[in-house]
Amino acid sequence: QWLTAQEVTANMLSAEDGVCMLPVPAATALLMKDPGVRQALDLSAEWDAVSSTPLPMGCIVARREFVEEHPEAVDAFLDLYGDSISFMSDEGNRSEAAELVAKYGITANAQIAEAAIPQCNLTLLTGEEMQDTVQAYYEVLYRAAIGGSIPYDSLYYLP
């Protein structure tokens, strides 16, 4: 049964025992709310133990027509996105970054954001590095989970 992060958190907070999988920052919020909950494993660390590429946990999606008609806008967006990742990842910016995360509703408050940011593994991979990383991830998934086959190279933005 699929549940939202909020539903999983509510279930864990109301149960005496249980196991769940939550993304950061939802996991961070749960750990802060209930001292009886513990992190049993770190998926990124587990992945790193068996793979030469990082674990991809998110992506940027755009319509092909937009990318083809506005490549300069896509490149500018990726540059700004990279700047944002650098800002968020700089320990000296942690408090300000946490305030922004809370302000824009990504977390319930800045305290959760400040604790979660170091665990987020924020990165931006582009070009062939991104393609190699995602391809390695697809190789370990059940084919049915990704539509029966690994996507074509045309799926990737390779400027």
Task: Enumerate the predicted regions with their spans.
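Conserved C-terminal helix/tail region of periplasmic/extracytoplasmic solute-binding proteins
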Residues: Q135-P159
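Secondary-structure end/capping motifs
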Residues: V67-R143
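Short secondary-structure capping/turn micro-motifs that flank functional sites
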Residues: T28-A29, I117, Y157-L158
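Pocket-lining segment of extracytoplasmic ligand-binding domains
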Residues: E7-L100
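Short, solvent-exposed coil/turn linker segments
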Residues: Q39-D42, T126, P151
